[in-house]
Amino acid sequence: MTSFAHRCGIHDDARAAALSRAALLAGGLELVRFAWCDVHGVTRGKTLVAGAAAKAMMDGVGMVSTLMLKDTSDRTAFKVFEPGGTADLPGFGQANNLLLLADPDSFRQLPWTPASGWVQCQPWFQDGTPVELDTRRVLQRALARLAAAGYGMKCGLEVEFHIYRIDDTRAQMDPSLAAWPGLPPAVSLLHPGYNLLTEAWYDLAEEPLRIVQHTAQALGLPLLSLEIELGPSQVEAVFEATDAMTAADNMVLFRNAVRQALRRAGYHATFMCRPPFPNIMSSGWHLHQSLVDARTGANAFRRDAPAPGTSAADAGHTLSDAGEHYLAGLLAHARAMAVFCTPTVNGFGRFRPNALAPQSVLWGRDNRGAMLRVVGECADAATRIENRIGEPAANPYLYLASQIHAGLDGIERGLRAPAATDAPYGDADVRLPTSLGEALQALQGDSTLVDAFGSAFIQYFTRIKQSELSRYELAEDKDDFQRREYFSRF
């Protein structure tokens, strides 16, 4: 009998070889987690006993389709049981089943739980057609468009987050206090903060940071450093640059893994931008990006010598023509792409003056107050653009796809960047959105990004985010809303 993977047209010699490698790695395992990344960047899925996992690698794992329609509280944002409730979403009516098919190349043994494997999946309709609303497919399409233009993408990740010591879970686990969403655990600080990169605070935090290190390295993630950030209990993980899809996959796995591994040891890790406490510092996800020539692998942003007639304030002094066009595209679509970089109500509280976070649509040369920071000099093979508007709770596939579509528009139209800023918190012609609602409106008003992502995806995405926003606007206690909505879930 033909397997579901064959019917989907994805089972070739390469996948068969990857399955063989996964089978070798799976020896001695008892359980395998089949995981999928939802629109919010949260992993969901099913855990199968080892005896059932081999068949599931070929025939898929059933998943209720409403998992793709959830807002950040896990409420379904579409009326799937009402006539016309999913008219714009063919194949999603009546909470029907989708099938998850695994990528055997992603198979790993989990280091924090005994005899358990993990494999990454993507959803398919039961007739063997791909679910195009899947966010990993959104990035795959963006990368295909980039490849057609002759480029690949390389990304390095700098991820700030918070680790707390768990003091009490009684309220969180008290059945009489269960709610939708519920209370997070009671926590205390890991380090007092306000002493950036100090070794003494690192020593205070070493036990959980060693767990982060061992977990990341056991999973094969290209971790470079773990650092003490400025805020209380705030840390940062820095990763070596990889191709774009690998970087996005790594971000999904890293967040998922460290939260679980730390929880077992009595710590609470959160990638919520602004945890629900006074005197915190916001966390950002700084995305370093460059394009590479698809034929040679050379950095397409590198310029061997400054363009004639340019000064240090000009993009062409450091960036190639393609690099300047890409930079200009990011600036042109900054307001529209902001919701993919900062997709939560909570994250927009980060955009404030003199906080090492941007407020305006500007670029700077090695300027950490600017939205876009150009890093490198002429003839530097590591020349790149750092986007500083992302929050660590962002869906990695959508974050990276937004960069590709915005940057490619700049290349295709030959856009030129304005002069670099040396006053990122001064007056500016264009400001970043200051709320989720404003960011959604900016996205809907940008026909270039709507066309690039596809109007069906934009309608789907905005409907789900609007559900989150509407509940926030109705909440009497806005702080309690964010505490319950984000602190445990991200």
Model-derived features with residue positions:
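ATP/Mg2+-dependent ligation/transfer catalytic cores
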Residues: M1-S225, A247, R431-F490
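C-terminal accessory/tail domains of diverse enzymes
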Residues: T2-G27, A35-V42, T246-A247, A257-F271, ...
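Glycine-rich, often proline-containing surface loops adjacent to acidic residues and nearby aromatics
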Residues: A115-P123, P232-E240, S283-H288, A382-R384
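Secondary-structure boundary elements
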Residues: A144-K154, H214-P222, A247, F254-T270, ...
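Core alpha/beta catalytic barrel or barrel-like domain that forms the active/cofactor pocket
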Residues: K154-H162, W180-E199, L219-V238, A269-H286, ...
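Short beta-strand elements
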Residues: D174-V187, W285-R295, V361-W363, A370-G376
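Short, contiguous, pocket-lining structural segments
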Residues: A200-P208, S225-G231, D243-F254, F277, ...
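Hydrophobic/aromatic-rich core segments of domains that either
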Residues: M272, H286-A305
